[in-house]
Amino acid sequence: MSAPIGATRAERWTLLAIGVASFELVAGALWIQLAWQEDPCPLCIIQRYLFLLIALFTFVAAAGGRRVALLRVLSLTTALAGAAVAVRHIYVQAHPGFSCGFDALQPVIDSLPPAHWLPPVFKVGGLCETLYPPILGLSLPMWALVGFSAIAVALGWRIRAQAVIRTA
């Protein structure tokens, strides 16, 4: 008996949950930005892009088709890249003094098309070294690291489960 080409029902629900969680994390960041007046830095914006990219990959994978395995791997790679950006952000906040009121990433991030289409969402307004009050004891980059790590674990688990199914 051959293994199914597309995603199983359980995998589709997992992929949908990951996509929704990614959107919710970006929505939470926007709420913090607008309600608490905490401007996002370039690394925050990069993390938003990566969460949205994960959502895109997982939603397309959940829709099915022949490229589910590729989309799973792309989602996992994006989550790992997001975790790396979050770790860098945590490091910058732990070692302030890298910038002199200007972040070298700002012009690059602000020149991307989404920054022109949706400035409140993708426009840089703060510095990466700025510390905001923690939420439940963790800074925002730490929460992003938790989110990216949880997504990576869930995707890794699904990839492993799918590999076991195919070898059986």
Swiss-Prot record:
Disulfide pattern: C41-C44, C100-C128
Example of a GO MF term: electron transfer activity
Endpoints of the signal sequence: none
Record bears the keyword Electron transport: yes
Compartment list: Cell inner membrane
Name assigned to this protein: Disulfide bond formation protein B 2
Lineage of the species this protein comes from: Bacteria, Pseudomonadati, Pseudomonadota, Betaproteobacteria, Burkholderiales
Key words of the record: Cell inner membrane, Cell membrane, Chaperone, Disulfide bond, Electron transport, Membrane, Oxidoreductase, Redox-active center, Transmembrane, Transmembrane helix, Transport
Family affiliation: Belongs to the DsbB family.
Organism of derivation: Burkholderia lata (strain ATCC 17760 / DSM 23089 / LMG 22485 / NCIMB 9086 / R18194 / 383)
